[in-house]
Amino acid sequence: MAYPLQLGLQDATSPIMEELMNFHDHTLMIVFLISSLVLYIISLMLTTKLTHTSTMDAQEVETIWTILPAAILVLIALPSLRILYMMDEINNPVLTVKTMGHQWYWSYEYTDYEDLCFDSYMIPTNDLKPGELRLLEVDNRVVLPMELPIRMLISSEDVLHSWAVPSLGLKTDAIPGRLNQATVSSNRPGLFYGQCSEICGSNHSFMPIVLEMVPLKYFENWSASMI
């Protein structure tokens, strides 16, 4: 989860988020190099009175500043496309969870189990226990097994919502009448927080998401107790 005054992204918990962080660093380095080059050229233009008479009519220079940006765009596009394809792949999920957005709460249905469904509301500030997080805690957490591929089917009952958990690299729109899907996979156990990331009305800020990733044994015990 994010902390006050935090710089940078949240700690990666899934392989997709690790890839996204690597891509962020890769792109940031390219942007830094381009910005440094531009600032250097501007400083030269401002500090020197010397000019090249054929600068504005140099075929070689035009060739360079046409090919070089194209090569840079390719360096950015290739890893980006690779990650997009990875995010779309869902290979043999062990579990499917249907997520529905409402104004202003989430409902979850474990489609592999009979009658395992519940609504998830934010806990009001006055009802929080010591150590719990304001505007992030819910009355029913989404319990999932760790280190296993899980398919999330995401839609909405009313208006546009967006189901997002940053530390897992997840952000999928919940659109009425349309079913989107995403893959959830966690490398470690723990609580992972998210929020609705699409302005959906006056209580948009009060739609937190809490995933509780546990070992498979504990998940089986939890699911048996819920049925």
Curated annotation (Swiss-Prot):
The keyword Signal does not apply. The keyword Transmembrane helix applies. It comes from the Eukaryota. It is a multi-pass membrane protein. The modification Phosphotyrosine is found at Y218. It is found in: Mitochondrion inner membrane. Residues 1-14, 88-227 are mitochondrial intermembrane. The chain crosses the membrane at residues 15-45, 60-87. Cu cation A1 binds at H161, C196, C200, M207. Pfam families: COX2 (PF00116), COX2_TM (PF02790). Mg(2+) binds at E198. Its cofactor is Cu cation. Component of the cytochrome c oxidase, the last enzyme in the mitochondrial electron transport chain which drives oxidative phosphorylation. The respiratory chain contains 3 multisubunit complexes succinate dehydrogenase (complex II, CII), ubiquinol-cytochrome c oxidoreductase (cytochrome b-c1 complex, complex III, CIII) and cytochrome c oxidase (complex IV, CIV), that cooperate to transfer electrons derived from NADH and succinate to molecular oxygen, creating an electrochemical gradient over the inner membrane that drives transmembrane transport and the ATP synthase. Component of the cytochrome c oxidase (complex IV, CIV), a multisubunit enzyme composed of 14 subunits. The complex is composed of a catalytic core of 3 subunits MT-CO1, MT-CO2 and MT-CO3, encoded in the mitochondrial DNA, and 11 supernumerary subunits COX4I, COX5A, COX5B, COX6A, COX6B, COX6C, COX7A, COX7B, COX7C, COX8 and NDUFA4, which are encoded in the nuclear genome. Belongs to the cytochrome c oxidase subunit 2 family. This is Cytochrome c oxidase subunit 2.
